[in-house]
Amino acid sequence: MKIILATSNKDKVKEIKAFYKNYEIYALNEIMQPFEIKETGSSFKENALIKVNAVYKKLEEMKLENEFMALSDDSGICVDILGGAPGIYSARYSNDMVIHPTDESNRAKLISKLHKKNVKTSPAHYTACIALSCKSGNFTTHGFMHGRVIDEERGNNGFGYDFMFIANGFSKTIGELDENTKLKISHRSKGLFLMSKILKILNRSF
């Protein structure tokens, strides 16, 4: 089974490939020219479906829908003391500060927001919605990772807000954990695991 991801983000591609070793996984730019997808949804699920449907439509235009399934991920971090922000805007949280938001600028803004609340830490959780589009229709799953954010960056293994997030039951940030541990506890892995159950069923008729 071949799966095209609705992303060319090397970190996400690496994580998904590590989880789905039994499938042929391709980044978006390996199959088609990357194109802009406007994430206009109001939830992780809506945005994940917007992305995966846009990619699957391109597959149909390329007459590849019988060869590929499309998979997308929309994820982010929700911080309690900030009312759930940055949430679905996690990847572009600092777009009011810089023209092109980066992981670094997003983390800097989150730390600044914590300091404005006069706190160094807050309960938080990651959410990931995994969406699949294929001949059989659309399917979605969710994964969560609960813990807390801190106002400093620690570690060098990860991306996004990993360096300032500590999962429940751990004393190290996600950025300080090894890959195997991350794969076991991450929100994305949990969502991918649930999606793997759906993929196994679909694989029988694909």
Curated annotation (Swiss-Prot):
Cofactor descriptive note: Binds 1 Mg(2+) ion per subunit.
UniProt-annotated catalytic positions: D74
Domain of life, per lineage: Bacteria
Catalysed reactions listed for this entry: XTP + H2O = XMP + diphosphate + H(+); dITP + H2O = dIMP + diphosphate + H(+); ITP + H2O = IMP + diphosphate + H(+)
Keywords: Hydrolase, Magnesium, Metal-binding, Nucleotide metabolism, Nucleotide-binding
Stored InterPro entries: dITP/XTP_pyrophosphatase, ITPase-like_fam, RdgB/HAM1
EC category: hydrolase
Any Gene Ontology CC annotation: cytosol
Cofactor(s) of this protein: Mg(2+)
Keyword check for Transferase: no
EC identifiers of the protein: 3.6.1.66
Residues noted as binding Mg(2+) in the record, renumbered to the chain: D74
Any single GO BP term: nucleotide metabolic process
Residues where substrate binds: T7, S8, N9, K10, D11, K12, S75, F159, G160, Y161, D162, K182, H187, R188
GO terms assigned for molecular function: dITP diphosphatase activity; ITP diphosphatase activity; metal ion binding; nucleotide binding; ribonucleoside triphosphate phosphatase activity; XTP diphosphatase activity
Family statement drawn from the similarity comment of this UniProt entry: Belongs to the HAM1 NTPase family.
The protein's assembly and partners: Homodimer.
Function according to Swiss-Prot or TrEMBL: Pyrophosphatase that catalyzes the hydrolysis of nucleoside triphosphates to their monophosphate derivatives, with a high preference for the non-canonical purine nucleotides XTP (xanthosine triphosphate), dITP (deoxyinosine triphosphate) and ITP. Seems to function as a house-cleaning enzyme that removes non-canonical purine nucleotides from the nucleotide pool, thus preventing their incorporation into DNA/RNA and avoiding chromosomal lesions.
Protein name, per record: dITP/XTP pyrophosphatase
Protein's organism: Campylobacter hominis (strain ATCC BAA-381 / DSM 21671 / CCUG 45161 / LMG 19568 / NCTC 13146 / CH001A)
